[in-house]
Each structure stands twice: as C-alpha cells, then as structure tokens.
Amino acid sequence: MPRRRVVGQRKILPDPKFGSELLAKFINVVMVDGKKSVSESIVYGALEIIANKSGKDHLATFEGALDNIRPNVEVKSRRVGGSTYQVPVEVRPVRRNALAMRWLVEAARKRGEKSMAQRLAGELLDAADNKGSAVKKREDVHRMAEANKAFAHYRW
C-alpha cells in the first residue's frame, strides 16, 4: 500500500465492437497468456452464437447473465482467539463484477462443448436463465454466508 496517497483505479477502454467497458473487462478475463485477439474472437463468437440461438439482444443477454451470477455477500476468514470464523461480508461492486466474470469463465472452461466460444455461449445462456455452474457457485457462496450469519458481529 502506498504511504502518500490512494492510487485511483485505472479506467479501462471500451471494447471496439460494442463500446462496452464491461465487455472489455470480460475479454481481459477470458484472455490467456496475453493473447487478446484470441480472447476477443472467443467472446465475439460466443455473442454471435447467442444471437443466433436465442434471437434476443446478445449484449443484454450477457449483462443479464452477469446480473444472475454477481454475489451480494461472501465469507471471509477471521481469526478470533485461536479459532477461525467464516464471517459474512458484503461484496463491493467492483469485486462483485470481477467474481462474476471469473466464475463465468471457470464454468465455461469446465463444459463439454467443442470450442471455447460454444462453451461460453452455453454458460451465458444458462446463466441468463438462472441455471448453470456459475449460478450454482453464487448460490453456494450465498448459502455459506447465510449459514455463518451468527458470526456477522465479527465484521471489521
């Protein structure tokens, strides 16, 4: 942590095709080994597949899917007097987006379709319908927070 001043968060440039900052961030999350053009083709391919399959607006489907994956609360470990408690805490908006994108990509990578674009499209469509592994992950995190609600007074 800097001693002098708090460093502001960098603004990310919107993606060239749709002009969405959220989509640009997602492209960066999908990216592996700095190959941005590959990740762009994967994400744009997935959005194309969504447009063909569902017939709905692909950008709206993407944002709806992210809304269904974003966690509201999570648990953090807190050590109190020799024992560790899982303390439920609210998730900040930036982290909420980051977790949703990370879980979405992880869930897509575990799927069985042929190409990554197809896996991503499938997971996005499932998430838009409140199904799929990424939504299940969010439900598990919420369930964990609910189970540990008794330790909420240990919040810092």
Curated annotation (Swiss-Prot):
Signal peptide span: none
SUPFAM superfamilies xref list: Ribosomal protein S7
Gene Ontology MF term list: rRNA binding; structural constituent of ribosome; tRNA binding
Cellular component, GO annotation: small ribosomal subunit
One Pfam family named in its UniProt record: Ribosomal_S7
Keyword rRNA-binding: yes
Gene Ontology biological process terms in this record: translation
Record's keyword terms, sorted: Ribonucleoprotein, Ribosomal protein, RNA-binding, rRNA-binding, tRNA-binding
Family, as annotated: Belongs to the universal ribosomal protein uS7 family.
Subunit record text: Part of the 30S ribosomal subunit. Contacts proteins S9 and S11.
Function comment: One of the primary rRNA binding proteins, it binds directly to 16S rRNA where it nucleates assembly of the head domain of the 30S subunit. Is located at the subunit interface close to the decoding center, probably blocks exit of the E-site tRNA.
NCBIfam families in the cross-refs: rpsG_bact (TIGR01029)
Name recorded for this polypeptide: Small ribosomal subunit protein uS7
Phylogenetic lineage: Bacteria, Pseudomonadati, Pseudomonadota, Gammaproteobacteria, Aeromonadales
